[in-house]
Amino acid sequence: MSSEKEYVEMLDRLYSKLPEKGRKEGTQSLPNMIILNIGNTTIIRNFAEYCDRIRREDKICMKYLLKELAAPGNVDDKGELVIQGKFSSQVINTLMERFLKAYVECSTCKSLDTILKKEKKSWYIVCLACGAQTPVKPL
């Protein structure tokens, strides 16, 4: 009987440490990207906010996006990404969806509540919801 009691106590302790099922940390509902085309430049107004919500550094997201678009650009003081070249919002949103699938979404539980971790030359997605650690291609 005591071993059963200990088992139940250990289970209770385990469940108290696990996050609640279905709980959302705020990263599950991402803001829409505000994309403006001014002349021959494309500006993403809320780029810094978007990167904060997915828990990725601006530099990493910018590097991926600019590499895929094959265009120069930079993040200004206001947190806006300024890209040299005219790109439609559909193209940018498609590329960011690919980035989310490859470098943000947990392959095990599909949660966006993850962090990107670099160990030596390897990159990993570490899920904060289920604890899974998935290797990804380096940027």
From Swiss-Prot:
Q: Does the keyword Protein biosynthesis apply?
A: yes
Its domain of life reads Archaea
The record ties this protein, via SMART domains, to:
eIF2B_5
In the record, the note on similarity to other proteins reads:
Belongs to the eIF-2-beta/eIF-5 family.
Q: Which HAMAP family match?
A: eIF_2_beta
- Entry's NCBIfam families? PRK03988.1
Q: What protein name does the entry list?
A: Translation initiation factor 2 subunit beta
